[in-house]
Amino acid sequence: MLKTRVFSHYDVTGIAPPLFFTTLGNYYYMEESIGYAWSNTPLSYSTTVQISEKLLYDMVYNDADEGWFHRDTLLDPCFNYADISVSFNFNEIYLDVVMINARIDWISTPKISNGNFSLKGRLTDDNFIPKQLIIYRDEPKPDRINDHSYSLGEPVAGVIPKPHYYKSIETIRPYKWRMDSSIIEVEFPLKFFTRGVYTILLHAEDKRKIHWSPYTKRKIGECGIMMYSFLVK
């Protein structure tokens, strides 16, 4: 953001963060929160730290103007890691916080090969039970850089073995399917040719029953544990 001077979740072509997470080899479920501050005097290192701390504080306690999305992302107990980055020049600060749910020890990392998507891994926390594998589609648009938040787009398909099926989206039958509290193993065909960014998201149920109060429509106990995005041109 500092390089392009564009304060947005989206890049200038309208692509959201999940594609860049995948490109960098990050396959866990992640959510990004960003903050910006400007100073009319040159910034020192200590001042930059203080302002960054205030940006983080406001994301939790003064987030009404942003619909409390930052607050709920930062406090959601689904996540067990946070990656915090700060970039700045003489009078601008850009803060990027990525919350990560890293609970899979990969045996075979998620990948696309010969038109098929596959993954295999061990769950490191048996409180998380895999539930749904949903595919979303988002269409990149340059004017999205003005949006205050980002999304994965609309659900277009779900992966599930017979005899189950999805009513409102396409149902894809997997070649391999194991979903339990110890091992996840999936392989299924990809059938998407319409231009867009597709995100494969594995949802899980969190059995820990941690009590907290989201201010948004976020569902308590429903956690993403794997996310893989790819671009169809």
Predicted regions span which residues?
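Short, solvent-exposed loop/turn elements at domain surfaces
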Residues: 3-10, 43-44
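A well-ordered secondary-structure block
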Residues: 14-100, 133-139, 158-203
